[in-house]
Design a protein with these regions (language model features):
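Arginine residue identity/basic-tract feature
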Residues: 12, 46, 69, 97, ...
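Terminal helix-turn-helix DNA-binding modules in bacterial transcription factors
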Residues: 55-94, 116-122
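Non-catalytic, surface-exposed connector residues within folded enzymatic/regulatory domains
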Residues: 14, 32-33, 64-67, 114
């Protein structure tokens, strides 16, 4: 009985994680993405979403979204010749300046320095 209950809980957690990740994947590039939008899309309250995300993902919603944006930004910096403004827009930041500041916090270098390093093969 206990194992069955645990298995059902794990299925629900995995279902939540899948739906959450799918929604973020589809919408991370929107600079106006909000927790309320995600909660509505997943048919739960904002509070429930925060709790489930923390339990299931071991991180906050904002942190998860920013990590996704940074991962995609790194990919674009390595694989494209897009400008910083274009990359910022594609990964969900309203300005290149804000994107640059957040990128530097996450990586320790500016997006331009990151791109130059990658082009040199370092």
């Amino acid at each position: 009985m206990l194992l069955e209950l645990q298995a059902n809980l794990e299925k629900r957690d995995q279902s939540f994680i899948n739906k959450f990740e799918e929604y973020v994947e589809a919408h991370y590039s929107e600079s106006d993405l909000t927790v309320d939008q995600i909660a509505t899309a997943l048919a739960m309250s904002r509070a429930t979403l925060y709790i489930k995300a923390k339990e299931s993902l071991s991180k906050g919603i904002g942190e998860y979204i920013e990590e996704k944006r940074m991962k995609e930004a790194k990919k674009l910096l390595k694989e494209s010749k897009l400008s910083m403004a274009e990359i910022a827009e594609q990964v969900g930041y309203s300005t290149a300046r804000y994107f640059s500041a957040r990128f530097k916090i996450h990586t320790g270098v500016s997006p331009l320095a990151y791109r130059k390093k990658r082009l040199k093969g370092l």
